[in-house]
């Protein structure tokens, strides 16, 4: 990370703009569009650049997704007339309590309000982002797809003044290839970081500026998703199913989902809290098990799997949100922890956080300010409906950390009983007290999990799954997964925890092999398989793995996810 502009990278191209946004997700694009619309309405010239590491906006983003349209209604009131790919309203909610063989369908009258989706829509977030990017570009926003941000630039007073994009064309050993292109310095009056959960630059910023001081540790889950195409008689457009219980044990947070889209497609997935304790647990394998349950299998057993992906999700709630205000920058969306875990939704909260950031920055630019701390963003955030919603959803995962029974009871009290008593604001707050990387028990004190071999029709192996993600990385580039201490993977992870990275990674990136010459075990990193879920950066017991951005465009390329 550079401390000043007076570094040795004098050969870099430099681009200047008013506002730079890192990440073309719902938060980043909404901030860009709102800023540009405000500038256009006021007759002001405003240059806005959005960087995205994907080959095109939406290519590597992943969500369930059931979307609350509230924030989009505010940003683009006529989104339907503009052809937004939001076609399938939710028609029915089901909440299923699963055992290994049975299913309890919770009566509609007892479904907590946070699981109700009347007025919401089932969407492909990737398709929505492509459309939203088009809206932003039409308004005058510049989107640089295929460019990853790898460094943060500061002035002499440690104010953020922009970023550097990644070099293109280095060999695996770091030497330059023919046609090498140095990264570009992009300078801005304000920089917005909208990288999504566990953003690599946000991680650095939180540490550098102590943005998590006094906060509860952030808590994460992994969401694993498959897209299925099924016969018309198995498709029920608008049906939303959430499951809890099996296949996860009572100590593990999480649940399944099935969202029936409008074109004979079903989005199916499993969310697993990364605070799980059994190192033998494999979120990928638990997802495969979920599909074998009769209440799930009946919807897909004559279908075909056509998509696969995974992504970390932040769900620590308000108590775990870092301070989003930086000297010269802001954290927004899932980078700031705005997902509402209790509703299993983060699109509308990301959009709203981006809109609030746009308001704060636009007013600052009107006052001829730049590169200072936008404390008014925090004020506007706390005055919004977004903050009220996050407050009411903040206890969801912390309660489940105390066990499934307590989680059920307290969710029922907070999201069913209190609303019916006329109490709109939950009068207590529960906090997460442990980071996810310290929750594993030693392997020899944990029950080993044995998973069935895949049948290739309903259940699958990891490599055939990664193939469906359309992930591509140039093999001859520096490995983007950095190991700080080469001894830890063997002496601690393998010897104590049984090598959990082989199981928590949903893409087969990490593999323990015996060296043919020394006969010693070693960790092999198949970085070309990486689908950018960020789980290794979160769950590694000693925080010995750091996820960094590979070359721009080297990402999953999801279709319809």
Language-model segments: residues:
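N-terminal FAD cofactor-binding segment of flavoenzymes
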Residues: 45, 53-102
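N-terminal Rossmann-like FAD-binding beta1-loop-alpha1 element of flavoenzymes
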Residues: 19-49
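Predominantly flavin-linked oxidoreductase catalytic cores and closely associated redox partners
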Residues: 126, 131, 135-296, 356, ...
């Amino acid at each position: 990370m550079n401390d000043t502009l007076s570094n040795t990278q004098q050969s870099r191209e430099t681009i200047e703009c008013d506002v730079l946004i890192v990440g073309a997700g719902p938060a980043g694009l909404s901030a860009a569009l709102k800023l540009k619309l405000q500038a256009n309405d006021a007759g002001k010239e405003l240059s806005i650049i959005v960087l995205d590491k994907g080959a095109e906006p939406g290519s590597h983003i992943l969500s369930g997704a059931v979307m609350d349209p509230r924030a989009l209604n505010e940003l683009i009131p006529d989104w339907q007339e503009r052809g937004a790919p939001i076609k399938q309203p939710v028609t029915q909610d089901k909440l299923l309590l699963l055992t290994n063989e049975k299913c309890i369908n919770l009566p509609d009258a007892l479904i907590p309000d946070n699981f109700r989706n009347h007025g919401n829509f089932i969407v492909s977030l990737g398709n929505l982002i492509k459309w939203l990017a088009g809206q932003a570009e039409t308004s005058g926003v510049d989107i640089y797809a295929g460019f990853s941000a790898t460094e943060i630039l500061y002035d002499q007073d440690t104010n953020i003044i922009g970023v550097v994009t990644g070099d293109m064309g280095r060999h695996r050993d770091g030497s330059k290839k023919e046609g090498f292109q140095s990264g570009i310095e992009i300078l801005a009056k304000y920089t917005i970081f909208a990288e999504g959960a566990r953003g690599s630059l946000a991680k650095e910023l939180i540490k550098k500026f102590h943005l998590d001081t006094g906060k509860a540790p952030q808590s994460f889950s992994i969401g694993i998703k498959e897209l299925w195409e099924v016969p018309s008689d198995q498709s029920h457009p608008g049906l939303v199913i959430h499951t809890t219980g099996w296949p996860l044990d009572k100590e593990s947070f999480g649940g399944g989902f099935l969202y029936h889209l409008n074109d004979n497609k079903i989005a199916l997935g499993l969310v697993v809290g990364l605070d799980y304790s059994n190192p033998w647990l494999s979120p990928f394998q638990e997802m495969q098990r979920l599909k074998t349950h009769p209440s799930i299998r009946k919807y897909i057993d004559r279908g075909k799997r056509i998509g696969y992906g995974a992504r970390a999700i932040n769900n620590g709630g308000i108590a775990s949100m870092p301070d989003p205000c930086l000297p010269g920058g802001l954290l927004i969306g899932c980078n700031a922890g705005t997902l509402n875990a209790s509703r299993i939704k983060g699109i509308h909260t990301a959009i709203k956080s981006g809109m609030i950031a746009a308001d704060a920055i636009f007013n600052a630019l009107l006052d001829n300010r730049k590169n200072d701390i936008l404390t008014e963003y925090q004020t506007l955030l706390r005055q919004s409906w977004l903050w009220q919603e996050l407050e009411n959803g903040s206890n969801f995962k912390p309660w489940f950390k105390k066990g499934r029974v307590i989680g059920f009871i307290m969710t029922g009290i907070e999201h069913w009983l209190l609303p019916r008593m006329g109490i709109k604001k939950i009068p207590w707050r529960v906090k997460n007290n442990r980071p996810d990387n310290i929750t594993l028990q030693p392997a020899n004190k944990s029950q080993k999990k044995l998973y069935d071999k895949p049948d290739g029709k309903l259940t699958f192996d990891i490599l055939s799954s990664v193939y469906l993600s359309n992930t591509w990385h140039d093999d001859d580039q520096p490995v983007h997964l950095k190991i700080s201490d080469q001894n830890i993977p063997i002496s601690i992870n393998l010897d104590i925890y049984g090598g959990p990275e082989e199981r928590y990674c949903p893409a087969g990136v990490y593999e323990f092999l015996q060296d043919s010459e020394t006969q010693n075990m070693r960790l092999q990193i198949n970085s070309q398989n990486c689908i950018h879920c960020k789980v290794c950066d979160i769950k590694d017991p000693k925080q010995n793995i750091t996820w960094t951005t590979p070359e721009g465009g080297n990402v999953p390329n999801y279709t319809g996810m």
